[in-house]
Amino acid sequence: MSEKTIVKKETNVDFKKPKMYKVILLNDDYTTMDFVVEILITVFHKTAADATRIMLDVHRKGKGVVGVYTYDIARSKIALVEKMAAEREFPLAAVMEPE
C-alpha cells in the first residue's frame, strides 16, 4: 500500500471592508409625505417614528440620508424606490454618494 503525504499551506488573506454608500432621498413638490414614509418603512425597514423623522428632514432640507449600504444594496434600494414611485406616478428620486 502506498503512503500519501498531505501538505497544508497556510495562507494569509487580508479582507477589506467594502466601500459604503449613502442613499439620499430627494425632496420634490409632488410626492406625498405619506408615500415617503411608506417607502422608508418598506424599502429601508425604518420604524414609523424614524420614517416620519427622516421624511420631515428631507422635506425641510431638500434631501436626507436614509441609510448607508454596500454598492449593490444601495443600487437595488434606489431602483426599488424609483419603481414604486413610478407605479404611483410620483417623481420621488434617490441617489447615492460614497461615504
From Swiss-Prot:
InterPro entries attached to this UniProt entry: ClpS, ClpS_core, Ribosomal_bL12_C/ClpS-like
Pfam families: ClpS
Top-level taxon of origin: Bacteria
Transmembrane region(s): none
Biological processes, Gene Ontology terms: protein catabolic process; proteolysis
Function: Involved in the modulation of the specificity of the ClpAP-mediated ATP-dependent protein degradation.
HAMAP family attached to this UniProt entry: ClpS
Family, as annotated: Belongs to the ClpS family.
Quaternary structure note: Binds to the N-terminal domain of the chaperone ClpA.
Protein name, UniProt field: ATP-dependent Clp protease adapter protein ClpS
Underlying gene: clpS
